[in-house]
Amino acid sequence: MRRVLMVNFGVLLLFCFGVLSNSFGQDNGGDSDINSTTAVYIVTLRQASSLHLFQQEAEEVKRVRDQSKHGDTSKFTRPKLQPRNISRSRYWRSRRSAIAQAHDSLLRNALKGEKYIKLYSFHYLINGFAVFVSSQQAETLSRRREVANIVLDFSVRTATTYTPQFMGLPKGAWVKEGGYETAGEGIVIGFIDTGIDPTHPSFNGTDTSQRQYPIPNHFSGVCEVTPDFPSGSCNRKLVGARHFAQSAITRGIFNSSEDYASPFDGDGHGTHTASIAAGNHGVSAVVSGHNFGSASGIAPRAHISVYKALYKSFGGFAADVVAAIDQAAQDGVDILSLSITPNRRPPGVATFFNPLDMAMLSAVKAGIFVVQAAGNTGPSPKSMSSFSPWIFTVGAASHDRDYSNSIVLGNNVSIPGVGLALRTDEGKKYTMISALDALKNKSSVVDKDMYVGECQDYGSFDKDVIRGNLLICSYSIRFVLGLSTIKQALAVAKNLSAKGVVFYMDPYVLGFQINPTPMDMPGIIIPSAEDSKVLLKYYNSSLVRDGTTKEIVRFGAVAAIAGGQNANFSNRAPKIMYYSARGPDPQDSLFNDADILKPNLVAPGNSIWGAWSSAATESTEFEGESFAMMSGTSMAAPHVAGVAALVKQKFRKFSPSAIASALSTTSVLFDNKGEAIMAQRAYANPDQTISPATPFDMGNGFVNATAALDPGLIFDTSFEDYMSFLCGINGSAPVVFNYTGTNCLRNNATISGSDLNLPSITVSKLNNTRTVQRLMTNIAGNETYTVSLITPFDVLINVSPTQFSIASGETKLLSVILTAKRNSSISSFGGIKLLGNAGHIVRIPVSVTVKIASKQ
């Protein structure tokens, strides 16, 4: 008897969409009610999906026609389907209907007389459905011969004005694409996220130059129409928008008024990520009345299609996400951007075998480049939350702009801080008053300790004491949790006629990044607990008290706030952010490593300006604003999605792996000061605050948009290669067959991860010697390349050939022999650099972990 595979792991940012079906199945006379053991299951069937069947039949037609050209068709039967004579849309409609009917028939026959709710029928990327049933019914379904796999649905939750300049787009990649006026035009980027605010100028159907967008004829998506997403919300820029919440609705946790039963973004995250990748060029980013510059997406003329599957009140569920991926592929998106990661490793034979990664594998087979955030679970080794080689995983790095603020005390000590705030009057210092020393009821000890110091309640304070002075407030964990807000403290300070606000850090607030927050009055947040102690020590030592009563008779501490609305561009950058998830890539839940490099790349992800929804609530400090500054790998991924759109625009026939190769081999290893890129809490030196980054911190390096448009050589990987890799995993044959229909027993060419034709070489265990090969294709002109090596510690590298000439369109094989020089379990890193005489530089990082030398 086949067992039901129970998978229950959370995900750090997911969005979804699919073929919506809310069919309620009940056999005649059935009276068995759905009980407390019911749950949503994702069921995969053995029959191939529409996409796989279409491609198989198309290949068969081609084979017959090729044979006909040679005059021999006796051994072949012409397939019933001839893709040349039937439109894809007609084919998909017929297949969708047939597969959905088959799903309904299976459920009726298997669950006779019992109740169930089918949520979705998946037909395009995978053949299966999501269904709400009891555990006993799930067991019954698992015994059906048509059923390949049953997985318990799991919960999911959420995980630029300047960055185009920092990435060199205005004088580089945009110029190569004809300027920002055409950069990304004709390419559709799909976003699985929290939706979008269609009223934002970043998504207008005409850009700031009033040029209308063309119609992307290859795209067939639609726009939902609802009261809060009315007709006309979409245009030639925003070409598709849908929402999916069937799993949440079935569970009874969906609140339509709060979560918006439409593609409208009530959270803000989806609007932000979409604008980073493809927001219109030249949109003014005004926050709290201050203009912070003109915003632009990385591919400002690319089209956007939104698939909403995350919601502000509960997050989301995997069944909806799989449906979203399935629908996006049917619609014809070119790029798929997911700022999502599981917060626990998927159980089973390998991390790659889960419904999301398998759906994304089929999307890649359909020609879609899939970008995923690495996760914000760094900096620990093996904290990577995006696993599969067909997914392009992006970590987060800084850029050189910051909005520094500071406060100068009366003793001339300057303390750094954050806050997009006004400055106090130049050359003048103001008296500081602690909120705890300005209470109307000074005997309320509990309130003083627990709440009042956060300056959230106007009625607690004596206005006469605070008027015209700087109010000192505490920043506690309640701000992190959203129970207290900067915005409320500022409102209180204004009502009290304070001149400004100073927030000091509660010592219990550890490990949280405090982003610059908009303030419509002078203010500053001191993020360091140690610096906060300096402030408080000065303040307390400056108080003058009555010798008998100990009451304060004079506040002696004074200070001036420098303000933080002006940007500085002097930081050393990029550097890898501490929260960005690190490699090595975990192959399974037992901490075994995969021979796959993760992350693939890093991109700007820290303090990123992006469009913000008018109803957004994810960041209370930006509530009501049209732009917000956010940080995370969620912000890094759409940067790469935008660059991928530029690459796809130039090279229309590039496969997803070719795009990945172009992005990877051209990446940057040095910062703006010409030094090696650094990482906070780097993999090799986790105890040091900052040290040189390794491939396990930054993958191939920092994204280089301009160079990616002229990579010289590419390394292409096929769907069949991925199948050979999956079949090469010990014990994977049954699950590979269940998910893909591929029989590993008939696949003689199994390979390891290091044998995949990737633009990197990763070996988790080097036992004496291993030879790996890479097949290179020249997409530029004739060129001669010379090999340069950086040898990993304790590893010997031999590369053949050491020099080669390659014609345009030609392919050549590069052979690399790795030999362990001595036993070691410490990871070592190096690289292979191919220097072309026409100026191309192709970089291949080499990572080796465990090394076992031969006995002499």
UniProtKB/Swiss-Prot annotation:
GO annotation (BP), single: proteolysis
One annotated Gene Ontology cellular component of this protein: extracellular region
Chain ranges of the Inhibitor I9 domain: 40-159
Domain of life: Eukaryota
Compartment(s): Secreted
Pfam families with a match to the protein in the record: fn3_6, Inhibitor_I9, Peptidase_S8
Gene Ontology MF terms: serine-type endopeptidase activity
Top-level enzyme category: hydrolase
InterPro entries associated with the record: Peptidase_S8/S53_dom, Peptidase_S8/S53_dom_sf, Peptidase_S8_Asp-AS, Peptidase_S8_Ser-AS, Peptidase_S8_subtilisin-rel, Peptidases_S8_3, S8pro/Inhibitor_I9, SBT
Residues covered by the Peptidase S8 domain: 164-709
Signal sequence, renumbered to the chain: 1-21
Active site location: D193, H269, S634
The PA domain, residue ranges: 432-528
Keywords (A to Z) from UniProt: Autocatalytic cleavage, Glycoprotein, Hydrolase, Protease, Secreted, Serine protease, Signal, Zymogen
Record EC number: 3.4.21.-
Annotated glycosylation sites: 35, 85, 204, 255, 412, 441, 495, 540, 568, 704, 730, 738, 748, 767, 782, 823
Propeptide, residue positions: 22-159
Protein family (similarity comment): Belongs to the peptidase S8 family.
Matching PANTHER family: PROPROTEIN CONVERTASE SUBTILISIN/KEXIN
The protein, known as: Subtilisin-like protease SBT2.2
Biological source species: Arabidopsis thaliana
Highest classification ranks of the organism: Eukaryota, Viridiplantae, Streptophyta, Embryophyta, Tracheophyta
